Amino acid sequence: MLLCDIGNTTYHFFDENSSYKEDAKLFNPSSIKREVFYICVNSSVKERLSLLDNWIDLSLHVDMSRYYKTMGIDRIMACEAIESGVVVDAGSAITVDIIKNGNFEGGFIYAGVKAMNECYKNISAQLEYSFNFELDLDKMPKNSRDAISYGYLGLLYKEVASYGMKIYLTGGDAGQFSKLFLNSDVDELLLFKGMKNIMKKANLC
């Protein structure tokens, strides 16, 4: 079984033995002859894949009545991976979604680390600091780096922790956020687990 998560810059493949990426501009999807079950947020790639019979779009097998129309398919798959908990996908944007007993309860979107760094930098060169993910949030900051870190990370931490649920971290900055959410589970393959669950529901495997 070959799964693929396609973003704007890469094809991210996963099977039972390995995980690897291909450049979205250079990779030729017709070079793969076996069945590929995929999700895609890249409209031009998705149009190209629609012409290939062995590439199967899993978004067509999602019960969208459980979500909202404009919700990203990558967020949906991460939600499908768990029964209950908070999914924090820390990528270019940070998405936080609540799942209770297999039902999507809602979520919100927060600026990603790089975007927020740029935001502070654009306000003033004096605010160009990396965030301190090991900040003690029980103490008010007494320096600029900790002050911007507290403003950015503290609000997110308190909101996520307030739900009192198990926290699942995924995405490129998950490792950084694991320093903040100490009892969280970091799972870079969470989205693929959701894809497998959709396949089971649709009797595709």
Curated annotation (Swiss-Prot):
Catalysed transformations (reactions): (R)-pantothenate + ATP = (R)-4'-phosphopantothenate + ADP + H(+)
Metabolic or biological pathway, per its Swiss-Prot or TrEMBL entry: Cofactor biosynthesis; coenzyme A biosynthesis; CoA from (R)-pantothenate: step 1/5
Residues at which ATP binds: D5, I6, G7, N8, T9, T10, Y11, H12, S92
Residues where K(+) binds: D89
GO cellular component, as recorded: cytoplasm
Cofactors, names only: NH4(+); K(+)
Cofactor: record remark: A monovalent cation. Ammonium or potassium.
Gene Ontology biological-process entries: coenzyme A biosynthetic process
EC number: 2.7.1.33
UniProt: substrate binding residues: Y68, G72, I73, D74, R75, S144
Active-site residues from the entry: D74
Gene3D superfamilies: 3.30.420.40
CDD domains: ASKHA_NBD_PanK-III
Subunit structure comment from the entry: Homodimer.
Listed HAMAP family: Pantothen_kinase_3 (MF_01274)
Role played: Catalyzes the phosphorylation of pantothenate (Pan), the first step in CoA biosynthesis.
Name of protein: Type III pantothenate kinase
Organism of origin: Sulfurimonas denitrificans (strain ATCC 33889 / DSM 1251) (Thiomicrospira denitrificans (strain ATCC 33889 / DSM 1251))
